[in-house]
Curated annotation (Swiss-Prot):
Organism: Psychrobacter cryohalolentis (strain ATCC BAA-1226 / DSM 17306 / VKM B-2378 / K5)
Protein name: Enolase
GO biological process, any: glycolytic process
Lineage: Bacteria, Pseudomonadati, Pseudomonadota, Gammaproteobacteria, Moraxellales
PANTHER family in the cross-refs: ENOLASE
Gene Ontology CC terms, in alphabetical order: cell surface; extracellular region; phosphopyruvate hydratase complex
Cofactor-binding details, from the entry: Binds a second Mg(2+) ion via substrate during catalysis.
Cofactor(s) the protein needs: Mg(2+)
Superkingdom of origin: Bacteria
Catalytic activity, reaction form: (2R)-2-phosphoglycerate = phosphoenolpyruvate + H2O
Amino acid sequence: MYAEETNNVTAIKDIRAREILDSRGNPTIEADVILADGTIGRAAAPSGASTGSREALELRDGDQSRYMGKGVKKAVANVNSQIRSALMDKDVTAQQAIDDAMIALDGTENKDNLGANAILAVSLAVAKAAAKSQSLPLHQYIADLRNQTSLTMPVPMMNIINGGEHADNTVDIQEFMIEPVGFSSFSEALRAGTEIFHSLKSVLKSQGLNTAVGDEGGFAPNLRSNEEAITVIMQAIEQVGYTAGKDIHLALDCAATEFYKDGKYVLAGEGNKSFDSQGFSDYLVGLARQYPIISIEDGLDESDWDGWKYLTEQIGDKVQLVGDDLFVTNPAILQEGIDKKIANAILIKFNQIGTLSETLDAIYLAKKNGYATVISHRSGETEDSTIADLAVGTAAGQIKTGSLCRSDRVAKYNQLLRIEQQVRASYRGREEFIGLRG
């Protein structure tokens, strides 16, 4: 189970962690893994705002005298002591064995002792150091871990209007996204999305609406309804000459757990309009029929499996239904969803599970069972762009990494542009989506 010791240049000779700041100004953990030949792999853990109840534990200090209780000195100490001691002199290329060693060292199901943030920062830094030691780009190293021979560039889910937990506004649905599916390359898709983002700003300004941005770089205006967010995006698409439903499709992240109260889905921004499970499912079905929506994430509460079953039966053959809080990147929970025919896609956030190896397990379990995979950032991000390499190296097909502003989001898009220039990787566009293939 434990990584074997090695005397070669790929031996781990030091591990160092520190507190850094994420895109919300909160502390997170960054780790360096240093090899015998001086090679350094560096990675940082992201942090979420709306989180699933079954996510692996993000260890925070709880000391109100520092960073309002959000410090991560305990996680840093765990890396600099226990994890460092356990991994010294191990072969950095033994990713699975190293991840298994950290899981065993923690000894809990949800990584409660060491913290998933501590373990993840080291797991990703190990992969980066290993890739450098073999003179491989990170995406190729990740591909080689699971013998992924064909690489693809992901379709970006671009979050251009923020609501819910990601913005201080009246919009209940957390993310309104565009998917540029009608293009032949990632770079052209990115250009189209960027043009629509700027067009949306002018549409909002012309209507006297706020153009400040939320956590993930999307605009955060106060709107009269969730549907109004869709209509202003449709205007922005048309204004720059693209066709909604052909060049560009729409996607929603409801983050429904955040407005699920006492068995009801309550839209506070629409006068506390209330729905039961079937009623809210029907509301989403109606939106998907009226507008070119090809993906709905967390359309229902993470515990409302009957509701998920109903929604999947209604539109699961036409619309991508993505489980985020529902599956929390956990292979065991995903398998339960597969068995019960719940949803048809999974959002992949590696800090929900805590190691690169377990993340890959979830991705390939989904692929094996015909579920789409969407690699995702968190609302609290850093300049770390590992998810870009993960998306290409696993041929995931889709990536969700925010809007077209804020350097913490753009860093991932820029890394994808670099990768596209380096490798032969197709951009599959419409073929990635259940309702658009053929």
